[in-house]
């Protein structure tokens, strides 16, 4: 995770130049405790976009019994759905938002040094087939 103090924000004072988006990645695919599919995503004030690529990629912590899942996307409009109950990814009204978030997601992914999967043929195939 990117490390910056959140103290000013907690007091209701957002510092100038504060980042507008947060990138995260969950490597472990179907590991024993959480049973969560491997994914990465972006969170802004208004939206959360998640790409469940669902492949263990041989990562430590992934279940040795994990199988690959069909990749899928989720988009939540946090202004209307703070509990993240309605996936808006296939809603055409959000097409432009999705496109912009995907571009921003790749920039943040790279900026944070998360580029290991660029050397993984499996992940390259997933990105080619399911990202855009």
Predicted features and spans:
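Long, internal low-complexity/basic segments
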Residues: 68-70, 80, 88-132
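Short clusters of small/polar residues that mark proteolytic maturation junctions
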Residues: 53-54, 87-89
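C-terminal cap/loop subdomain of S1 sulfatases and analogous C-terminal strand-loop tails that border
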Residues: 1-74, 127-132
């Amino acid at each position: 995770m990117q490390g910056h103090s959140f103290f000013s924000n907690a007091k209701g004072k957002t510092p100038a130049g504060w980042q507008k988006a947060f990138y995260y990645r969950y490597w472990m695919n179907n590991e024993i405790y959480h049973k969560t599919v491997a994914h990465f995503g972006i969170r802004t004030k208004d939206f959360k976009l998640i790409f469940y690529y669902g492949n263990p990629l041989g990562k430590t912590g992934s279940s040795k019994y994990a199988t690959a899942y069909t990749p899928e996307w989720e988009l939540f409009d946090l202004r209307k759905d703070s509990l993240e109950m309605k996936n808006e990814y296939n809603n055409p009204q959000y097409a432009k938002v999705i496109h912009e978030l995907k571009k921003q997601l790749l920039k943040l992914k790279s900026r944070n040094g998360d580029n290991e999967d660029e050397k993984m043929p499996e992940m390259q195939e997933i990105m080619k087939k399911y990202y855009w």
